Amino acid sequence: MAKASLDTLPRSVPQKRTAGDLAKDLFVLSRFNRYNPLLATFSGVWATLLAGASKRIDHPGSISTEYVFKQALLVFVGGYIFCGAGMVWNDWIDLNIDKQVARTKERPLAAGRITNTEALIWMMAQYIASWYLIAYTLDGHNVLEAMIPVTISTILYPFGKRSFFKTIYFYPQYFLGFTLGYPSVIGWLAIKGQDQSLQDNIMESFALGTTVFTWVLYLNTAYSYQDIEGDKKANVNSVYFLAGSYIHYFLVFLAALVLGATSLQLKAQASQWLWGSWLSVWGYSFASQLSRFSAKDPSSGGTLHKENFALGVWTVFACAVELLLKS
């Protein structure tokens, strides 16, 4: 198993290093210098806004628009910090793999700019902070149910790249999809957690969670495909190896699943605005992305990833407008 010892340095840590250098490397280790952690916030924020709009329809005057936006902000910050902790965990477990892949070998741990101890202390600080924020957001209700599932899936994600999971046809994208999709439950709990049971909140957010799960499979498969040569050398398990030469058709299939699950959620919301601003925009974007993806050019997957991030940001706006329309 490719895992570093807690007391072993990945390489030699520079002898002269300022506190600013350490802070910068920890910032980069959590990917806070990139847009990637924001992907972990979309599901929870969308869910919070949609649940707020739904509650304003079912119980007019029972909840203010300002409160919903405040809860959405708390869910956003909690998810962002949690993702930072998950990035550190992933890099620690994948240390030896990252050294062999061109895109990852200069990450702070793989490059030896920080020690394992420093990384793990940073990881735990972020995890504790995210737990506190979610507990505060949910007013102490269903905190374990909100945090434990995503914690387990985050822990298992890097191990999903190992040969054991490959033998049972289980891929890391499944863990990642769950980790990024389950916060839809947290977002729903942030609005309706004290009004209805956990089971009801899960059921109402299930279609949205499925949307995000399949969306993550789609965008991560396209994105990680650019590492196919390095992953072959490192014997990394990934779902695009299952697709093989049919990778393009596989992405089309995943895009169809995303749109299907989205349709179920929007049907429950009963909003003409969301049908146009969400489903239509996503459908057009997927068609454009898939027309440009090439199995012969793995780097084309990187562009798809960025465009899907833009879709996520746009959908935050669409859900915010939906809330305002119901106010």
UniProtKB/Swiss-Prot annotation:
One of its GO terms (biological process) is terpenoid biosynthetic process. Its EC number is 2.5.1.-. InterPro entries: Prenyltransferase, UbiA_prenyltransferase, UbiA_prenylTrfase_CS, UbiA_sf. This is Polyprenyl transferase esdpC. It is a multi-pass membrane protein. It comes from Penicillium shearii. Keywords: Membrane, Transferase, Transmembrane, Transmembrane helix. PANTHER family: 4-HYDROXYBENZOATE POLYPRENYLTRANSFERASE, MITOCHONDRIAL, PRENYLTRANSFERASES. GO terms for molecular function: transferase activity, transferring alkyl or aryl (other than methyl) groups. Shearone derivatives produced by this cluster are interesting candidates for Alzheimer's disease (AD) therapy since they moderately inhibit aggregation of amyloid beta 42 (Abeta42). Pathway: Secondary metabolite biosynthesis; terpenoid biosynthesis. It is an enzyme of class 2 (transferase). The gene is esdpC. It is found in: Membrane. Its cofactor is Mg(2+). The chain crosses the membrane at residues 35-54, 73-93, 118-138, 140-160, 171-191, 202-222, 239-259, 307-327. Belongs to the UbiA prenyltransferase family. olyprenyl transferase; part of the cluster that mediates the biosynthesis of shearones, diterpenoid pyrones (DPs) which are structurally diverse meroterpenoids consisting of a diterpene linked by a pyrone, and which may exhibit a range of bioactivities. GO terms for cellular component: plasma membrane. It holds the Pfam family UbiA. PROSITE patterns: UBIA.
